[in-house]
Amino acid sequence: MSLFEKHKDVLARAIEALHARTFFAAFPEHPSPAVYGETADADGQAQFKARLGKRFEALKQANPDGWVGEEESPYLQEPLNIQYPSFTVDHLVSSSRQAFNTWRKVGVDDRAGILLEALSRIKDRFFEIAYATMHTTGQGYMMAFQASGPHAADRALEAIAAGYEELQRFPNHAVWDKPMGKFNIQLSKEWRAVPKGVSVVIGCSTFPTWNSITGVFGSLITGNPVIMKPHPGAILPIAIVVAEIQSVLADNKLDPHTCQLAVDTADAMITKTLVEHPDVRLIDFTGNSLFGSYLESLPGKTVFTEKTGVNSVILDSVDDIDKVMANLAFALSLYSGQMCTAPQNFYIPSAGVKTPQGMISFDEVARKLADQINGLVDNPKAGPFVLGAVQSKKTTERVKEAETRGAKVILKSRTFDNPMFKNARVATPMLLEADASRKELFSQELFGPIALLIKTKDTDQSIALAKEMALSHGAISCGAYTTDAAVREKIADEMALAATPVSFNLTGGIYMNQNAAFSDFHVTGGNPAGNASFTNPEYVTRRFTWVGHREPAKV
């Protein structure tokens, strides 16, 4: 049985899910022993620990120039001391170009089968990847398992499904028969989906697998070789993924350099040299807007970016203010505000928020939000696991600097005790108050656990400001609370014009931070927060070109 035959059913279900946009998950998100095996968690933790202080030798990339690695656990604030093979840019690109000549000629069914097999093997590494993610990013255990494991794999499957379908859109061959009166002109025509070439995927430090895997699999399914360039602070999770892809390639007598890992250090980064190489044709990037905009400006490259944005919450009217504040407190606290979809700017009318019991004043809304944050943080069974740890020292410095920005401090950021990791780098959410006239205080992303409560004249001004921020600075998510159908429609319409998806009236166990593969488009590509979207047709069709040949038909 071919790998395509082995996995074709899940591919068919994934393609169906792309169109239905209802719930679909091929990889169970709960780390249950009943699903993954009684010893899966312990085995994964042991596998992770066995890598510490050693060379990562699972890759099939021979003859490195050296071995480098500088990852540090945000929980232990100690180096992992894992060393990865490093290569020159010319070597990486040359190896990729050589692999391209073989990979592009592999049929789409076989490509899909190989990539689906890789995902099935990656599934067996979910727990090892989870611990690797925890100790490079600072994510809590559950998020690390879900985001880097099943949720990332579902996004990869989504890219495979989208690419596979687009590559089937047109026939490979057709006979063109044009009547000309007493005779016909007949041409035999063929069409080829031609991959663009070497693809570079640039990872980030907070979601090294989830944010990168869609680009990796999107390029591979469309016939392009991939060079995965992770952030120097978060290599291990995606290194495991690349190793599994290489293993499947080698098992099927294909060049493992079809997917390579390209590591560097903060003091000797290779990213610019790599992306500026004339043979690099495709670039996927997650990170800051300055570097993302530079990548978008490079001539002759097809670039897919997710950059920074200013995410808003519009508070107009609610049924239950306490449930709303509990939901928003969790959204703010989740992974200490280090998600690209985390809320930052909360627009609240100066008169307050309407409820069935009457108006809740601005100050009372602020107090309730602060109380909910404190209640979550101080809950030893929830706080440490929800907040996790802070990935970068720069983020903790940004939190300290935020107190000096000139806004009123409603709730100070503080540390807390993590019972499992006494030396964890932690910070609780900070709440600042600003008037709507002080745009300089809230017109940029403040990455980390920082939120601003902005006092507006009314909901119309709240909507206008949220739209302005999205159009000018980008936005990936928006939350809105209103019980008024007309207000809801106005928010939906105005934010749609700013290419920003809105989550309305969320309470309970669903949050504006979250996106579901096969249903939610992650980033729209329509505002400055990024030019691409997980996973619409354009995300894969821009990775190849349709080319047609024709000749007289043989009668």
Q: In which residue ranges do the predicted regions lie?
A:
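Short, structured beta/alpha segment
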Residues: 1-135, 456, 462-464, 469
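Short helix-loop capping/hinge motifs at secondary-structure junctions, enriched
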Residues: 320-324, 352-358, 437-441
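C-terminal segments
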Residues: 1-63, 92, 144, 148-171, ...
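Long amphipathic alpha-helix in the N-terminal Rossmann-like dinucleotide-binding domain
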Residues: 46, 90-94, 102, 112-127, ...
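Residue-level signal for inorganic ion chemistry
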Residues: 111, 223, 259, 283, ...
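Rossmann-like NAD(P) dinucleotide-binding subdomain of oxidoreductase/dehydrogenase enzymes
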Residues: 167-325
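Short, flexible/disordered intra-domain loops and linkers
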Residues: 237, 353-364
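Short, well-ordered beta-strand elements within core beta-sheets of diverse protein domains
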Residues: 79-84, 96-105, 181, 314-315, ...
